[in-house]
């Protein structure tokens, strides 16, 4: 079946026509049988005969393998290969990618010989409609006001009081078509046309929030008759992977979960028939079919060119890993191992060079044609040679199918309605642009009639009358007979392998992740050890006595603190769990595994860590503090704390899975800690808890834990003595004073309750994973259709601002990094060199393309030249117009569009550009001119209609990939730089958007600027818009640096003159040809070292002379200098940063709105639990309870503020690194803006909390006392918030900041003066009391409320005297704690700014 698909693969004679250079190694196929001796053949025949006598079950697990070096045949169990056997097998099969078609043909022939047919799938969709509901306009902004309005509106809708204000958005409108097996289908359409929604609908992966109508069938079966996620594979355009795993581990995990190779029943049938017909299979094919994940994984990695980075971690924005193009291929590889027969692939090749793109698509095409797969691939800029690989074309525009049929007829159809593709125009580019309102007119050929815009609806209607459309409609009328469907085509089981194998795969992965995060766990253990040492020296037995109930309270305080330490130690589990959830939800929805196989390892494998941490704590503290010396009670305390640790870890995992957001999770986690603490029986005794809160006491895990620990300690022999005035043992008195149960059975009741919580919370964690969905907005790119946006300006008037044209030269540039651990055993050098003696020059008015295959070092070179590298070793000379480059001044005159589009998520496009222009344009540019520049740049990159759209987070919300890319370019263009580096500016854009961007870049160059672009898949038009080419090969070496010439004539002449290089075909894309003929495989085949050829050429000598000339400054020139380090003065920087932070905070309800909601809940909780306790001044217990409310407030409200701000600062810090590298501002204004914006929100939080709590607790209504209460609360919340910021600034990532912060929370808790007063703290630790901010807060709050009270307790002691004698608080010195808490807030804010200035944790 050809149907216009270009070449056709036949299994009898290999490829029938033509041949691309990359796949010309068929003669050396690893599957060709060598002419061995007769003796060896006889031996092999005998071994095969022995294998055939085995039962079929055993035969499926046994194969023959030739071991190097002498080819010794060995009978192996494919399920349990030894290390040398695995190595030999991988070497034998490693060459399959060199002749992928040959390998597939051999496999197909093996099936054909015994009459086994492979299953195929025909997908039909009829009258398919997809709709979504969304708020539009300003109501769609996630502001605090809108958030609360949405909540009330949702309640109103549920009660049928109000009507819905969401508007329906049509994504796909009444589309129909057929996708057939053995056919490669290309899906084209501009962003926002509905491509992603169509692919997800066909794959059965659309979210439930989207309304779908119409019919989709596979082989005549509707989707409720089988499992579409197992029968098909959807490859997302969003790259979601575990950053800590390597490429090989990621693909291998997918293979283990989905079941690789071919269905087990088919393999058994194949072996049975071969045995009956006495057929001896090819040994490598036999091994490949029987092997599990390892061989298939390596095969896929080889095909996709990922074998070179197979053992490199994936990485993320903060951790260096694989490149963007490699990450995109990894997303494809993860799904290619699926046994599904239908593939729906969404923009899978963004960021890849045209040669690599061609190779990958061709490999997929070979698989589809030979094995009968069904495939739709959405591509943005397919090169002509890649376009020719497809058999069928689907074109979407405005949610309508305007063409669905053979590639051969698509141009005929558009000619029939008056549009013709120009001769040197890529057909795919033409098809992308012909439906566009802006570009359609240039293709109009009906000169006898006046042109008018023909809409997508009109084109779709015309297609129905075209003969292809009529044929599709006719075929749809006849249903596909279900009886024709192969029994194995559609999967009816949810999962690919047994539950045992899925559980084992998740266990193996969890162990790997724990190893990669081992530093975190080691740091936790070290921190716990330090805290244990601190605790045992604070509560040292020499200072601990057993002669009063008050002393018993100190012992109980040590137990309570130990519980909190163990509890807080599990807090980091929340952040780790949330970080993994996006990948989990993706894999769960694709039926990689059931949720319980994921949740069980994450619980069970953390248990040994809890066990060891508890041992450390109990072993260090138990005897030194002086708990009961009975060894049995020692182990009982260990058991109680261990079970409590498991329960609280389960609680934090449950919160993570329930909220799925770090900010909301930290708030909810703080609420749970607060409720557990207040109802534990320590802060408030059981008798003091109000009757309406007693239920909280009975369900609190901390109550059972503390009751268990207290019973274990105070019923011991050490406390079995009486004191004067009492007949009961002291231990029972201590227990009864706090309302605990003084019976020994309560130890086991408590342990049993905690075990119940362990099970319950982990079950709830699993239930959340089963039923809840990811918070990612999957369809954000479809809901913002933006491709019909009227006319835009043709030039950049605003870019014609005064600037100094600058050239940049670089000579003998070397860049190396420390040798990765994985390569140290194989390498003799201590460093890995990524750039090798690179030399060149970029000049004003010259547009240079920086090209090369993936891994050539293009981005690395740009990073080095732009000064963006933060690690590694750089050698060589870089000059700017003849003067040595100085990064401080260079950053002022250069712009760098990074490959990763990093922007603040909560500002609009216009605001992002305003911020960049405000800080980077000179001070003499007034606001009107600045606004004009911004608007013209937005018009230029066609973002003007979206100027009020929020940027959002990549893959989560806001702008689509291509809109984000255009914003990245616009942010740099508004800065009016002299030198611009653009790293893959057209990746992720469709052909039309790429052309728009290149026109903008060309206009920029024509103003006399120096512009360098890395580019991967340029069309002929785009490639020939460049003036010069800087071509690199893998390994970081240049192979051509020079002009392109008219129609690339200079480039073609240079390479065609090299012996062994094939001539370019007529009409072939020069960029694709150039990459093909210089590929590593061609270098190996022809024996040509293109680097040496270049360095021996006249062109190289000419370039060296040019570098020498440009490296010498002109006599009239001067070195680049500016009167100030930054474009704008310090005050303007502060105002700009504060302006952006104000917008970001107002539109961040998950932080601000949740914070206020939490504040109100906590205030009501405290007020109702401590109701009226401030008025009770007749006994000391009431004072302790009032102080307990203050202590709990500081701990919970403060920790919540600190924990919730950390993910916000962490996200913005990534943006800060980019903006600081561009010298937009210094770190101090940024830090001031981040700090200052918090102050009004904290003030409002303080007022809300203070008004509610002060009145409900019943403190004395005095103006001074109320002021001091608000004063200390405000600065306490402030220093906690700023401490959270500081912790992020001092640590490399959010998870580590959480661990570090938790250590200080617990230290502050210990030395706050509540668990153990100052007068009882050992002398050697009192210094820490004086530097503990919480101690000063409690000092201020207690002193201001009770330090001047003259009322007397029952025993006759004045309240003010007790406060002075017991706590050491002096009312006349109230100004001291006031000054100290203010100083702590200022100190932490200052250290936050200092950390931003001194540390850069971004590894590049």
Swiss-Prot record:
CDD domains: ABCG_PDR_domain1 (cd03233), ABCG_PDR_domain2 (cd03232)
PROSITE patterns, alphabetized: ABC_TRANSPORTER_2
Binding site for ATP 1: 189-196
Domain ABC transmembrane type-2: 501-714, 1132-1346
Localization annotation: Membrane
Membrane topology of this protein: Multi-pass membrane protein
Binding site for ATP 2: 852-859
SUPFAM superfamilies: P-loop containing nucleoside triphosphate hydrolases
Keywords per UniProt: ATP-binding, Membrane, Nucleotide-binding, Repeat, Transmembrane, Transmembrane helix, Transport
Alphabetized Pfam families for the sequence: ABC2_membrane (PF01061), ABC_tran (PF00005), ABC_trans_N (PF14510), PDR_assoc (PF08370)
Domain ABC transporter stretches: 156-423, 808-1059
Organism superkingdom: Eukaryota
UniProt xrefs under InterPro entries: AAA+_ATPase, ABC2_TM, ABC_trans_N, ABC_transporter-like_ATP-bd, ABCG_PDR_1, ABCG_PDR_2, P-loop_NTPase, PDR_assoc
GO CC, any one term: membrane
Family statement: Belongs to the ABC transporter superfamily. ABCG family. PDR (TC 3.A.1.205) subfamily.
Function as written in the Swiss-Prot or TrEMBL entry: May be a general defense protein.
UniProt-listed PANTHER family: ABC TRANSPORTER G FAMILY MEMBER 39-LIKE, PLEIOTROPIC DRUG RESISTANCE PROTEIN 1-LIKE ISOFORM X1
Name of the protein: ABC transporter G family member 47
Organism listed in the record: Oryza sativa subsp. japonica (Rice)
